Amino acid sequence: MKMKPAERRRARQSAVQAIYQWQITKLSAGQIIEQFSTDQDLSKTDVPYFKELLTGVIHRVDFLDEKLSPYLSRKIEDVDMVDKAVLRLAMFELTQRTDIPHKVVLNEAIELAKDFATDESYKFVNGVLDKALRSLKLREEEQGK
């Protein structure tokens, strides 16, 4: 069964909240998934994708932070927690889910920043990911993809 875009969006929204929670509590992915399954209405959410995003970000956080760092004007530790959750999620999709068009990842990240972060966060997220995408596209062109 093909997922609807709204179900994917809800998976990303839940994942940003779960990543934020993980960044603060350092609970395991399993514990956070259990909490979300109990406390949140996930009935119209692509739950397998939510789980993939959360576990993927947690297991690859050092790799994702390394990929983001060249495009940040400050250390990753100094980035707002919500912005960091959105950026990590987007970088996970850009590097691990190459079946999802870059434009979709960028647009979704901007919307997530608008939904959850400060008024100016979406501009920061857009700027970081735009620079990262340009670099990613150059590398793909060099590799002949």
From Swiss-Prot:
It comes from the Bacteria. Keywords: RNA-binding, Transcription, Transcription antitermination, Transcription regulation. Gene3D superfamilies: NusB-like. InterPro entries: NusB-like_sf, NusB_fam, NusB_RsmB_TIM44. One of its GO terms (molecular function) is RNA binding. CDD domains: Terminator_NusB. GO terms for biological process: DNA-templated transcription termination; transcription antitermination. GO terms for cellular component: cytosol. SUPFAM superfamilies: NusB-like. The keyword RNA-binding applies. Coiled coil: none annotated. Transmembrane segments: none annotated. Belongs to the NusB family. HAMAP family: NusB. PANTHER family: ANTITERMINATION NUSB DOMAIN-CONTAINING PROTEIN (PTHR11078:SF3), N UTILIZATION SUBSTANCE PROTEIN B-RELATED (PTHR11078). Involved in transcription antitermination. Required for transcription of ribosomal RNA (rRNA) genes. Binds specifically to the boxA antiterminator sequence of the ribosomal RNA (rrn) operons. This is Transcription antitermination protein NusB. It comes from Psychromonas ingrahamii (strain DSM 17664 / CCUG 51855 / 37). The gene is nusB.
